[in-house]
Design a protein with these regions (language model features):
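A short, well-structured alpha-helix characteristic of acyl/acetyltransferase catalytic modules
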Residues: 1-39, 155
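Short alpha-helical
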Residues: 10, 80, 126-127
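Alpha-helical elements of Rossmann-like donor-binding domains used by nucleotide-donor carbohydrate transfer enzymes
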Residues: 13-17, 41-44, 48, 101, ...
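Acetyl-CoA-dependent GNAT
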Residues: 35-84, 90-92, 143, 153-154
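Conserved beta-strand-loop-alpha-helix junction that forms the acyl-donor binding cleft
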Residues: 90, 119-130
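Conserved acetyl-CoA-binding loop-helix of GNAT-fold acetyltransferases
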Residues: 95-108, 130-134
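Conserved catalytic-core motifs of GNAT/GCN5-like acyltransferases
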Residues: 119-123, 136-151
Length: 155
């Protein structure tokens, strides 16, 4: 059964593993691909995203039974004054519907938390645009590099 799990510091090995995996991080190819996430960064990261999120950040692992299969998050972009979504499925688990289910759960939680709209910047060559459109997001803007998608949670 798919659920969202709040990771403890000792669970961040999975985030490190995903961020170090070339296939999982292929969506980030324009910015260098993989991102180091050594254990020395875990405490500060956990403090900012989990402990002291100030209502401006939300982060969970996607868990199917006892296996971590990805992550979902949203955060408030101060510069643009919008909430940005993050959905990453660990490469071995892609194509099994986890992204769609997790994005739907994330939207429900954001709505429960009083958020009216969610956005994401998706690279123009990233196939996840389809996922967002199927989950009710609409294209808000397009450039040569990325597509900004938006979903209204309150009508």
């Amino acid at each position: 059964m798919l659920e969202l799990y709040e990771p403890h510091i000792e669970d961040l090995w999975f985030k490190e593993k995903m961020m170090d995996d070339e296939h999982t991080m292929a969506y980030n190819h324009a910015y260098g691909g993989t991102i180091p996430f050594p254990k020395e960064k875990w405490t500060n990261w956990h403090q900012r995203w989990i402990t002291d999120h100030s209502g401006k950040r939300f982060y969970r692992y996607i868990q199917d039974n006892d296996a971590f299969v990805g992550e979902v998050a949203y955060y408030f972009d101060e510069e643009r004054q919008i909430y940005i979504v993050d959905v990453v499925i660990y490469a071995p688990y892609r194509g099994k519907g986890y992204g769609r289910k997790a994005l739907q759960l994330l939207c429900e939680i954001a709505k429960e938390n009083g958020i009216k709209e969610l956005y994401d910047d998706i690279a123009i060559d990233n196939s996840s645009v389809e996922l967002f459109l199927k989950c009710g997001f609409e294209e808000a803007m397009r450039s040569n590099e990325y597509i900004l998608v938006k979903k209204e949670l309150w009508n």
